[in-house]
Amino acid sequence: MARVLLLSLVFLAILLPALAACPQNCHCHGDLQHVICDKVGLQKIPKVSETTKLLNLQRNNFPVLAANSFRTVPNLVSLHLQHCNIREVAAGAFRGLKQLIYLYLSHNDIRVLRAGAFDDLTELTYLYLDHNKVSELPRGLLSPLVNLFILQLNNNKIRELRAGAFQGAKDLRWLYLSENALTSLHPGSLDDVENLAKFHLDRNQLSSYPSAALSKLRVVEELKLSHNPLKSIPDNAFQSFGRYLETLWLDNTNLEKFSDAAFAGVTTLKHVHLENNRLNQLPSTFPFDNLETLTLTNNPWKCTCQLRGLRRWLEAKTSRPDATCSSPAKFKGQRIRDTDALRSCKSPTKRSKKAGRH
């Protein structure tokens, strides 16, 4: 009996290390807590120790992530699946990963994200889905991600955002949707992420400013709309988050005009990019008070007294944007900061309250 017990113990001593061994051709560190299988020709998810916290499977070949693909590694905190030729992520693919914080799915061929794909990822904070072929976000897809902070969806093929697209992701703060095929943001599409602080929408196909969708946002500090075919910015465009907005990109949009009250409620703006557009004026309400940088080049500026606010701001700055007048003709080519066109302009007088309407 004692001999049988001894043999059993010896067998277990041999078997257990084998079960928890580092996968072939991989590198493991920290008592198998970090497993690195970068570009080793894998075609299925390897078996690793259940104590593994970081699993790097970059540059392998997993066309479909089936349900329960990672059920044996419940303690994962960081999962790297970049460049793995993934086409589809099935419902329940990450089931059981209740401690996962970082998920990298960048640079794949993902076209389909099934509803339920992110089930159980209640601690996920950083999700990278950039450089794929995702064309839509099914309603409820992100519902389990109650702690999501950063979502990178840039360089995909998303055409529109519908109501409920971000349902459940109430803590999302940074959202990147650059270089998609967006033509519209439907009203209600951003209602669930009103706490966004950084929102990048550059290099899409937005032909009009999405006022209704953006009006639900409350604390946007950085908004990027560069390289969209926008022609005008309407009244109250930034009002819902005007007390927080610090950086605004509107360069390379073919922008022709701002409505007079486009910047209503904007009080903290510090950096504005307006280069390579078709602007000839700025609205009289443009918020210069806290402005630190302003790029203006390659616009057909009309150097009349409507630019007096810009002139005053330029005179107070040591580093000045190098923009030039296009008209009137006698001032064409002169730098806005040097031209005589604005020297005689007087500040507008405030209308007496008695003269106002009653």
From Swiss-Prot:
InterPro entries: Cys-rich_flank_reg_C (IPR000483), Leu-rich_rpt (IPR001611), Leu-rich_rpt_typical-subtyp (IPR003591), LRR_dom_sf (IPR032675), LRRNT (IPR000372). The keyword Glycoprotein applies. Residues 321-358 are annotated as: Disordered. Residues 21-50 form the LRRNT domain. Glycans are attached at S143. Disulfide bonds join C22-C37, C303-C345, C305-C325. Present in femoral head and rib cartilage, as well as in tendon. Detected in bone marrow. Its main location: secreted. Coiled coil: none annotated. It comes from the Eukaryota. It is found in: Secreted, Extracellular space, Extracellular matrix. Residues 1-20 form the signal peptide. Mostly monomeric. This is Chondroadherin.
